[in-house]
């Protein structure tokens, strides 16, 4: 787009039409920007003429390229390697920091050229796409843009509208305008501007002024421009809007400013974009598959669980859902027994003094349900670790007791904003397979190996593969650097001995200790973080936890390992529901066996068979509907995902047998009731993933 004052296009579209003329703030903002840009270009030209000097740019393969500071850009270096590389590069990474391709290099540096496949490049690509959509939203609605970040799959932009709202009927109009913006190849320009100047530029938008006043603690910050849109933004961005090859707007909702229910209501529009239309087709197919697997739909259809407005964010587990919940906990309990964990029960409500000691009151009290009792402040616990510290501390401890592994399925509550609640994945009431290991420094390596083996055992039963990342000391860490180094070395040794591939995530640990991040991959390729293995050097200090060491030192400080495998049981049930698409493996299935009598004369025998399976602790039902044909009963049981369907007729009644088939219509034929019970008990005990095939 030329540097002239923006003028509005006209044209008829579905839904809302672009405004004509555009809101006055767009032109006022552009006028200010042009003056600032001219000053910036003049300063940069002077710097390039005066301060430019030869620099060395080191590529990932170690090769060095000659360049000039304040003149050479990453894009020029990419072109020097190959035009194809330059065209396919989304963003640069200079000295490990993402960097605009057209921003001049300033000193000797390392340079990486990131393509769309890289996660950081995807975030930049989707962030730039959000700006394209933001430009279209300003031109169609004329409201005040708020936040417009990239998210895990795509991007969104929030807008404040004085009146009216956004309708899905507007998507076509917005997409058409986005395509026009893309076709214009509007350049993304970066400008560093004084805070007070930006307060003047954005005086029409109270939300941008709030960001400047409350979040920007430096004298200057950056804005980015594409076409008529100028927005507060750290960047970086793609070179121009033409780099976005295909863009789809697919969802809208309302939300609150910064998620706070007492703040303004905003309109949120979601989009997705890709550098290849084929990727969009794949994404659409994936969305359809994910929609069919949505745990909220399956939970409703299979009568597993539901939510009610009278207790937002707290799930009601129906009998069949409760079976899944309890079976998961029993699975973990059985592993606890093998692995030396001791299960404990701790209070749900604690005096706020506990949370002040732990540090949660200072940093987390907004997310806690708190109330007054006899002029004292209490809160429902959002996590178990402080309670476990009290358990460790309730009597003197000896080195002989270490490692002490305390496990807790206690009910936890977190005061999530109502707008953030999403099925079982974001709740207020939940339970975790939570455990804390109190150990000596030299025991860390063995304990971490045990935790890793534990998670491999559990995830292999579910059929999940997983990714491991070691997150090490951040810049702002607490404690002795030697202790950190020793602990990180032990974590590294544990991971190497574990034998699975892992990656280093330097500087991404918590301030109180390094951690191992674990992501599981589900049946449709999505990654979820559930397990936690986190070292904590600070909580033992806060609670003044000590033990008597073997040399008699009674002030030895333990280390705490926070660990969970399922994480939130509720969230794991959501993931498993979607992973299996409601087709539960036999051991976890809430519908394991359906007994189907051929006709009314076999009903009594069918009832006896059902009772035998019930007594053997199977989830068993019987279909005695006289209005259904045999084939219809079998089909209904298969559609309801009963793992095994036991047909009983006169022949089976006479011989004390059942005729077995599976939900996938594999026929196993006739077996005695006793044999069938015994075999199914074996498969259940083995937690077989393919019990129907293995029968």
UniProtKB/Swiss-Prot annotation:
Record keyword Repressor present: no
Region: Disordered, residue numbers: 1-21
N6-acetyllysine: residues bearing it: 215
Catalytic reactions on record: tRNA(Thr) + L-threonine + ATP = L-threonyl-tRNA(Thr) + AMP + diphosphate + H(+)
Keyword annotations: Acetylation, Aminoacyl-tRNA synthetase, ATP-binding, Cytoplasm, Ligase, Nucleotide-binding, Phosphoprotein, Protein biosynthesis, Ubl conjugation
CDD domains for the chain: TGS_ThrRS (cd01667), ThrRS_anticodon (cd00860), ThrRS_core (cd00771)
Signal sequence coordinates: none
Enzyme Commission number(s): 6.1.1.3
Compartments, record wording: Cytoplasm
Post-translational modification note: ISGylated.
One cellular component term from this protein's GO annotations in UniProt: cytoplasm
Modified residues (Phosphothreonine): 218, 425
Residues that bear Phosphotyrosine: 270
Presence of the UniProt keyword Transmembrane helix in the record: no
GO biological process: threonyl-tRNA aminoacylation
GO molecular function: ATP binding; identical protein binding; threonine-tRNA ligase activity; zinc ion binding
Residue ranges of domain TGS in the record: 51-115
Main location (coarse class): cytoplasm
Its biological purpose: Catalyzes the attachment of threonine to tRNA(Thr) in a two-step reaction: threonine is first activated by ATP to form Thr-AMP and then transferred to the acceptor end of tRNA(Thr). Also edits incorrectly charged tRNA(Thr) via its editing domain, at the post-transfer stage.
Known partners and oligomeric status: Homodimer.
Family from the record: Belongs to the class-II aminoacyl-tRNA synthetase family.
Protein name (Swiss-Prot/TrEMBL): Threonine--tRNA ligase 1, cytoplasmic
């Amino acid at each position: 787009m030329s540097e002239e004052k923006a003028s509005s296009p006209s044209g008829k579209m579905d839904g809302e039409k672009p405004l004509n003329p555009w809101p006055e703030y767009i032109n006022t903002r552009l006028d200010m920007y042009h003056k600032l840009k001219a000053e910036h270009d003049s300063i940069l030209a002077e710097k390039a003429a005066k301060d430019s000097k030869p620099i060395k740019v080191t590529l990932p393969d170690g090769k060095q390229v000659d360049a000039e500071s304040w003149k050479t850009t990453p894009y020029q270096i990419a072109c020097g390697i190959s035009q194809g590389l330059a065209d396919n590069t989304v963003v640069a990474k200079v000295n490990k920091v993402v960097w605009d391709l057209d921003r001049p290099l300033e000193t000797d540096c390392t340079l990486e050229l990131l393509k769309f496949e890289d996660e950081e490049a995807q975030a930049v690509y989707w962030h730039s796409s959000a700006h394209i959509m933001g430009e279209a939203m300003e031109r169609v609605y004329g409201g005040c843009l708020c936040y417009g970040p990239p998210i895990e799959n795509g991007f969104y932009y929030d807008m404040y509208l004085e009146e009216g709202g956004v309708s899905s009927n507007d998507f076509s109009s917005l997409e058409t305008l986005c395509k026009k913006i893309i076709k214009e190849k509007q350049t993304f320009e970066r400008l560093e501007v004084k805070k007070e100047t930006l307060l003047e530029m954005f005086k029409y938008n109270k939300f941008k002024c709030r960001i400047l006043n409350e979040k920007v603690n430096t004298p200057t910050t950056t804005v980015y421009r594409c076409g008529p849109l100028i927005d507060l933004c750290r960047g970086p961005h793609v070179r121009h809007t033409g780099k976005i090859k295909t863009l789809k707007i697919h969802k809208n909702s309302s939300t609150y400013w910064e998620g706070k229910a007492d703040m303004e209501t905003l309109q949120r529009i979601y989009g997705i974009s890709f550098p290849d239309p084929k990727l969009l087709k794949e994404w659409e197919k994936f969305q359809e598959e994910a929609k069919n697997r949505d745990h909220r739909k399956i939970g409703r259809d299979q009568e597993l669980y539901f939510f009610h407005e009278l207790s937002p964010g707290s799930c009601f587990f129906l009998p069949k859902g409760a079976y899944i919940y309890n079976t998961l906990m029993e699975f973990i309990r059985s592993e606890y027994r093998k692995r030396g964990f001791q299960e404990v029960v701790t209070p749900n409500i604690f005096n706020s003094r506990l949370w002040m000691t732990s540090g949660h009151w200072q940093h987390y009290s907004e997310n806690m349900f708190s109330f007054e009792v006899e002029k004292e402040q209490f809160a429902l616990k959002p996590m178990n670790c402080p309670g476990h510290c009290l358990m460790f501390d309730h009597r003197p401890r000896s080195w002989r007791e270490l490692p002490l592994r305390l496990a807790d399925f206690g009910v936890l509550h977190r005061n999530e904003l109502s707008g953030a609640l999403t099925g079982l994945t974001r709740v207020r009431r939940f339970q975790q397979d939570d455990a804390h290991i109190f150990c000596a420094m030299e025991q860390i390596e063995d304990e971490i190996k045990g935790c890793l083996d534990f998670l491999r055992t559990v995830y292999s039963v579910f059929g999940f593969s997983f990714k491991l990342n070691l997150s090490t000391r951040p810049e702002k860490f607490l404690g002795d650097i030697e202790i950190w180094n020793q602990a990180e070395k032990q974590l590294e040794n544990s991971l190497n001995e574990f034998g699975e591939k892992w990656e280093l995530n330097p500087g991404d640990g918590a301030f109180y200790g390094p951690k191992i991040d674990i992501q599981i991959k589900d049946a449709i390729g999505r990654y979820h973080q559930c397990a936690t293995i986190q070292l904590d050097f600070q909580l033992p200090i806060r609670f003044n936890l000590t033990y008597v060491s073997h040399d008699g030192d009674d002030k030895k400080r333990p280390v705490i390992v926070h660990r969970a495998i399922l994480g939130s049981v509720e969230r794991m049930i959501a993931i498993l529901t979607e992973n299996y698409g409601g087709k539960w493996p036999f051991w976890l299935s809430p519908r394991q066996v359906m007994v189907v009598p051929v006709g009314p004369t076999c009903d009594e025998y069918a009832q006896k068979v059902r009772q035998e399976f019930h007594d053997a602790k199977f989830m068993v039902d019987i279909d005695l509907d006289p209005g259904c044909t045999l084939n219809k009963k079998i089909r209904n049981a298969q559609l309801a995902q009963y793992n095994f369907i036991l047909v009983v007729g006169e022949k089976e009644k006479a011989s004390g047998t059942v005729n077995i088939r599976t939900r996938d219509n594999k026929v196993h034929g006739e077996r005695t009731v006793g044999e069938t019970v015994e075999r199914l008990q074996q498969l259940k005990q083995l937690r077989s993933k393919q019990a129907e095939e293995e029968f």
